[in-house]
Amino acid sequence: MPVDVGTLPPPAPREAVSAAAHLLASVDGDPWGRTSPTVYETARVHAWAPHLPGRDRRVTWLLDQQRAGGLWGDGPPAYQVLPTLAAVTALLAELDRHPEAGHSSLGGRLAAAVAAGLDTLHGLSHHDPLPDTAAVELLVPGLITEVNDRLDAIDPEAAHPALAPVPHGRRLTAVHGIPALPRHRLAERLARFARLPVKLHHCFEALAPVCPPGLVPARPDHLLGSSSAATAAWLATATAAPGAPGLDRLLRSTAARYGGLFPETARITVFERLWVLTTLHRAGLLATFEPLARRWVSALAAPGGVPGVPGFEPDADDTAVTLHLATELGVPYRPEVLDPFRTGDHFACYLGEDTGSVSTNAHVLLALGTWTRHHPDTADHGNTIRLLGRWLVERQHGDGHWDDKWHASPYYATAKVTAALSRHGGPEAADALRRAARWVRETRRTDGSWGIWGGTAEETAYAAQILLDAPEPPTDVLGCAHAHLTARADDDGPPPALWHDKTLFAPDAIVRAEVLSTLRRLDRRLPAPAPVPPGFDAARTGPAD
């Protein structure tokens, strides 16, 4: 049963327990999860399935999302490459489908947006590598090829004047140093598989143009790989397959949920509930809501491991967080569920993983340490805990931070690692914790916030967590974090997109849980009123550095 909001006290400003109650109620009542639509997914769905509800909204939204410099997407230019390629492809497809609109005012906007995007893509420097986002090594080269195919199909005499010069000598040979991937090369790669790996279902839109029928996944029970774009591509290449109308209905319901737009993963309820619960538990905010927490965790604690979203295989990250919560809440679940992910001195996030994840291994360390604390007389996990702690310490950067493939910000990775090491890393982790705290102190912005591209409440919460887990938490800097978070605790707009999927997204409820729980921990740690460094102005919101 969903939480009955009517039985809860109204949320007093910055009153953590009441705010947590309302957050849990909203999560419990939402079967989708709270995440942001993205330019990439919306553009790819529109290119594959323009018939879906919200066509006009998608086109207008994509046009409105273009930045002044010609790119699309969040973050710095390296992050904007993929959404820009997707947006250009979608707008070129729109012009191709409706040539009669080419010389209309809308056609002019479409053509100008495409021309500006292509011009900027041509001029991008590639000094910074592309981010380690999902399947970027397939998606970017494949989209370069698709853009070029669409450019080659333009009739210069019929094109809008803004596009007329584009096809001639303006093909994209490479973007950000990444060359196009010819379709026959992609087909050769796919020919190596007897069965398409499940991890590639999420990016099937990149494979669909050349995927042989024998490799096309069977009709999924959910969105293919929890991706609307992958599902739209599957439908476009398997329209006669049994169950295709059901998938079309799923896409239509996703479009209805997001106003014609699409997030990169739907639905995120498993991931959302686990991260919200473990974050609130850390601050002691779950005691009142243990029946709800047990219900969620009991439903998720599958014997074969926990997939973060429908259509994915189980992964060590979600499984470890489930084990940690189950152990704390008294829900039966055993650490052997993590054994398939063990790889030497650490754990793979999922089978067939290309790059390791420090946040996943931090969650495993926390889960095994928690299990050992609750079950001291059972199987000994001490050696695994020691190896994991050493593996994490060895991956700390010289300035004191960690980074991770699941999040753009080093504050996220560092907070997750220090949370685990401070509890289960032993004395040998103390120096690493001090280095992390020193890095946080040295990277504070002058407006009292922290952030990789600009100060955010989310990253400020992570910074405070790192300091709280330090051997000697600095009261003055914690007071600064408290003041900044308190000034922004009632912000109700969407948080900045910092989490990695195919591009950047923002899991709203998880971010709000991080801020809530951090304020709760700070309230309990600091004297009242919390100290504020001299000259601190909580009202400042502009760039600090």
From Swiss-Prot:
- Quote the EC number: 5.5.1.30
Tell me what reaction this enzyme catalyses. Answer: (2E,6E,10E)-geranylgeranyl diphosphate = (13E)-labda-7,13-dien-15-yl diphosphate
Q: Does the keyword Metal-binding apply?
A: yes
Q: What Gene Ontology terms describe what this protein does at the molecular function level? A: isomerase activity; magnesium ion binding; terpene synthase activity
Q: Name one GO biological process term.
A: diterpenoid biosynthetic process
Alphabetic keyword roster: Isomerase, Magnesium, Metal-binding, Plasmid
Task: Locate the motif DXDDTA motif.
Answer: 315-320
Q: Where is this motif: RXXDGSW motif?
A: 444-450
Give the protein's cofactors.
Answer: Mg(2+)
For region Disordered, the annotated ranges are 526-545
Pfam families with a match to the protein in the record: SQHop_cyclase_C (PF13243)
Keyword Metal-binding listed? yes
Q: Which InterPro entries match?
A: SQ_cyclase_C (IPR032696), Terpene_synthase-like (IPR050148), Terpenoid_cyclase/PrenylTrfase (IPR008930)
> What functional role does this protein have?
Involved in the biosynthesis of the labdane-type bicyclic diterpene labda-7,13(16),14-triene. Catalyzes the conversion of geranylgeranyl diphosphate (GGDP) into labda-7,13(E)-dienyl diphosphate.
Identify its protein family: Belongs to the terpene synthase family.
Present the record's domain note.
The Asp-Xaa-Asp-Asp-Thr-Ala (DXDDTA) and Arg-Xaa-Xaa-Asp-Gly-Ser-Trp (RXXDGSW) motifs are expected to bind to Mg(2+).
| Name of protein | Labda-7,13-dienyl diphosphate synthase
Q: Which organism is it from?
A: Streptomyces clavuligerus
